[in-house]
Curated annotation (Swiss-Prot):
Taxonomy of the source species: Bacteria, Pseudomonadati, Pseudomonadota, Gammaproteobacteria, Moraxellales
Cofactor note text: Binds 1 Mg(2+) ion per subunit.
PTM sites of type Phosphoserine: 104
Top-level EC class as recorded in UniProt: isomerase
Enzyme Commission (EC) number: 5.4.2.10
Cofactor: Mg(2+)
Entry protein name: Phosphoglucosamine mutase
Processing and modification events after translation: Activated by phosphorylation.
Native organism: Psychrobacter cryohalolentis (strain ATCC BAA-1226 / DSM 17306 / VKM B-2378 / K5)
């Protein structure tokens, strides 16, 4: 079976695959794959491990570390840091892989594992498949770990190292992405840290560049990550920007790879708006932009008017990355806030993306609301339909007929997208139309029909 979804391995803690026993085996077989891929190297393979602020992260961290060490792989423990920090530090430490313990924007009771290759990018399909195959083999042997996890001579075991300066290294990396000729003096910035991995580093980066920072949701307790805060719940940020009369608001998600922003008037600027500003007014001229199937048609039209090419990838930042590399472009992302600026970082990074927007504001002397003029969002309605178990809606004829009828209604003036989540039992229904009422009615009607049939 395939243990990997669109963004690593994810689930509810305590249920397969997110159990200590499974995670131990995952660390072990991943270690074996790294050893096989580095047979000609004179040194042991090494990995860096970071996490977000979930309580379950401590248990998973220990199990992963033990699995890697048992396979003969050295481990560098970085503690709570954003996902993009782990991608950067994987390269900085010359490690063979990076591992992030996080379920991103999900609630605290979920957790997951994401991997980076030695170059700080998402794992190749080939390496992911190799890990998956070894997991299949080890899970097939019931109740006898010694049969599938041979004990090494103690001299061959991996070592465990805790790194104290990882946070400082990442902060300097982020600051280095901001143009040296500008600073953030005289800017008041509200930062919603989602009680997640960026709770410490995000406000500090902004302060060290000169901003007056008001940090909210920056006191994680292990269970309040993403709880009515962060990029998936920006209402509190919008209120805070207005309350403190701030110049801009920035909201991260739980693992710090997604960002949405709020302008000085309290208006939300999602990933599409961020891409529009960076593509049309950013410091680096771009030939084209990669969005996804979820990107608003308004972004496509606005970029076309600016003579900038636009193409859509499948949903997921790994697919955006693949499309960017195929086209030789540097800018892409998703409405949810995964923003890839490949001239600055090799993965989606909320802090670095926000700094590029702040740089445009400072360079042009304009407010964020002024920078987003010219980008008109087409009415869009997104409804998430949670199911009791993962099911394919396209296997039910009644649903297929309903989808076809809706697409015919929208032809030439809107879009319908039906998509299964890659990480949880959920169907996403997205409707775009030049008629806002039609959007709401059609999306809700289709969602109700999916729920009634699939349960």
């Amino acid at each position: 079976m395939s243990y990997f979804g669109t963004d690593g391995i994810r689930g509810k803690f305590g249920e397969l695959p997110i159990t200590p026993d499974f995670i131990l085996k995952l660390g072990y077989v991943t270690g074996l794959v790294l050893i096989e891929n580095n047979q000609n190297s004179p040194r042991k393979p090494s990995v860096v491990i970071g996490k977000d602020t979930r309580l379950s992260g401590y248990v998973i961290e220990g199990a992963l570390q033990a699995g890697f060490n048992a396979a003969g792989v050295d481990v560098y423990m970085l503690g709570p840091l954003p996902t993009p920090a782990i991608a950067h530090l994987t390269r900085s430490f010359n490690a063979d892989a990076g591992v992030v313990i996080s379920a991103s924007h999900n609630p605290y009771y979920d957790n997951g594992i994401k991997f980076f290759s030695a170059d700080g990018k998402k794992l190749t399909d080939a390496m992911q498949n190799a890990i998956n195959d070894k997991l299949d083999a080890i899970m097939a042997v019931d109740g006898n770990n010694d049969a599938v996890m041979p004990i090494l001579d103690p001299a061959q075991l991996g070592k465990n190292n805790r790194i104290d300066d990882a946070k400082g290294r990442y902060i300097e990396f982020c600051k280095g992405s901001f143009p040296y000729q500008y600073d953030l003096d005289h800017l008041t910035v509200v930062v919603d840290c989602a009680n997640g991995a960026g709770y410490s580093v995000a406000p500090r980066v902004m302060r060290e560049l000169g901003a007056n920072v008001i940090a909210i949701n920056n006191k994680p307790d292990g269970i309040n990550i993403n709880a009515d805060c962060g990029s998936t719940h920006p209402e509190g940020l919008q209120e805070a920007v207005l309350k403190y009369e701030a110049d801009v608001g920035i909201a991260l998600d739980g693992d710090g790879d997604r960002i949405v922003m709020v302008d000085e008037a309290g208006n939300l600027v999602d990933g599409d708006g961020i891409l529009y500003v960076l593509a049309t007014q950013g410091q680096t001229k771009v030939a084209g932009v990669v969005g996804t199937l979820m990107s608003n048609m308004g972004l496509e039209l606005a970029l076309k008017a600016a003579d900038i090419e636009f193409t859509r990838a499948k949903v997921g930042d790994r697919y955006v990355m693949q499309e960017l590399e195929a086209n030789g472009w540097i800018l892409g992302g998703e409405p949810s806030g995964h923003i890839l600026c490949l001239d600055k970082s090799r993965t989606g990074d909320a802090i670095i993306a926000s700094l590029q927007i702040l740089a445009v504001m400072q360079a042009r002397g304009k407010a964020l609301s002024d920078l987003t003029e010219g980008f008109e969002v087409l009415p869009q309605k997104l409804v998430n339909v949670r199911l009791s178990q993962m099911q394919d809606p396209f296997e039910h004829e009644e649903l297929v007929v309903a989808f076809d009828k809706a697409r015919a209604t929208l032809e030439g003036r809107g879009r319908l997208l039906i998509r299964q989540s890659g990480t949880e039992p959920m169907i996403r229904v997205m409707v775009e139309s030049d008629d806002e009422i039609e959007c709401d009615v059609m999306a809700n009607d289709l969602a109700d029909k999916i729920k009634a049939i699939l349960g």
